[in-house]
């Protein structure tokens, strides 16, 4: 009832491990949101760094960030990052690169390949350092059992809203 058409909710959730098995609650929660009328607009990954090691399984280094929307999102302000090889010409996907073939192709088509720009839209796996002096400078936040980096919240808010928009935090910032 609170999210209007075009509005977005970002649900960050990880699975608990109980008696040696992951619970799968993250997927059940995403499906529940869909049953309530939300679209699952994107499934993103919050990749956590700086975690203690777990010795009986691969370390749980991520949580899901389900981007849920009422209809098509009204706003998308993509975060841009520098390209690894700016100004380099793009190669055709799924083909072996050969300088001779490239010269022949250009001669046949008369077209030059488009160079890659200096930046690109960030992918949907977002990496953040966690822990003391990384997630937040606010010591009281570390009393919360599920703290999230302030930058994660900021990046999601910037991505899905414009200045002056109403942003509702049902947890009142308790985890940031």
Annotate each predicted stretch with a short phrase.
Residues 1-176:
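Core catalytic lobe of class I
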């Amino acid at each position: 009832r609170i999210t209007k058409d075009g509005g977005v909710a970002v649900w960050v959730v990880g699975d608990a491990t109980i008696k040696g098995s992951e619970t799968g609650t993250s997927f059940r929660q995403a499906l529940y949101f869909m049953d309530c009328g939300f679209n699952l607009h994107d499934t993103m990954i919050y990749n956590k760094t700086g975690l203690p090691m777990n010795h009986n399984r691969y370390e749980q280094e991520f949580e899901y960030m389900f981007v849920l929307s009422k209809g098509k999102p009204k706003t998308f302000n993509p975060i841009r990052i520098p390209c690894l090889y700016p100004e380099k010409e793009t190669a055709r996907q799924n083909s072996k690169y050969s300088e001779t073939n490239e010269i022949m192709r250009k001669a046949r088509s008369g077209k030059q390949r488009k160079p890659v720009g200096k930046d690109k839209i960030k992918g949907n796996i977002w990496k953040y350092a966690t822990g003391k002096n990384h997630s937040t400078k606010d010591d009281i936040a570390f009393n919360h059992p599920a703290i999230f980096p302030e930058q994660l919240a900021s990046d999601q808010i910037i991505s899905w809203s414009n200045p002056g928009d109403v942003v509702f935090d049902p947890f009142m910032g308790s985890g940031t």
